[in-house]
Amino acid sequence: MEKMNWTPESGDNFTAIYKNYILRVERMGPQKWWWAVYKDNEDLCYDNPFTRNAEYGKKLAEQCVRDDESGS
């Protein structure tokens, strides 16, 4: 899988687009980050509870895409 190009948005939020996936990481509070992955505009996976930082949220979102592509 190619490297994800994460784009910063307003605040401490990030988005990456890969094929037909949209990956998002958003800051929800001090040391609270939420991540989600959408495929074809439908929920694929998301985090609950929150992760500890943006980088970890990005890794979890990318793992979701890898798992989906491999059929895991």
Regions found by a protein language model. Name each.
Residues 1-9, 34, 38-72:
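Mixed-charge, Lys/Arg-enriched low-complexity segments
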Residues 1-34:
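Short N-terminal "domain-start" leader segments
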